[in-house]
Amino acid sequence: MTEPVWLNAADIYSIHKKIISVSGGKPGILDGGRIASSLNKAKNVFYYSENSDIFNLAAVYGYGFVKNHCFMDGNKRVGLMVVYTFLGINGWELIASNNDVVKVFSELAASQGSQAMEIETLAQWIRENTRPI
């Protein structure tokens, strides 16, 4: 697989700002280090893991931003939009229904499973709910 187009911290801040302005919530960053960690984890998986297709990388991003609680509010929404944006800039479109998206990201936020299991579950769901642009 060729190296994907990555998101950066400015992209994440922009996504969060837009989410809060459109759908409400408390603005603010809880921990900038968690944002960097969530961004770097996907790159680490790409460079050092055999399981690094675009869907798994999107799931790593989604998991990181949902579970790391980087922001005061909007973490699930940021996680979803990071997945959507990352897929989009790499030639894929998430086509799941709004109800499915809400269910999957709410379940992810509440999950107590292992990180590896949750990422694989999310990656499989993304794989089944995308199409090339």
Protein language model annotation of sequence segments:
Residues M1-I133:
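FIC/Doc superfamily catalytic core
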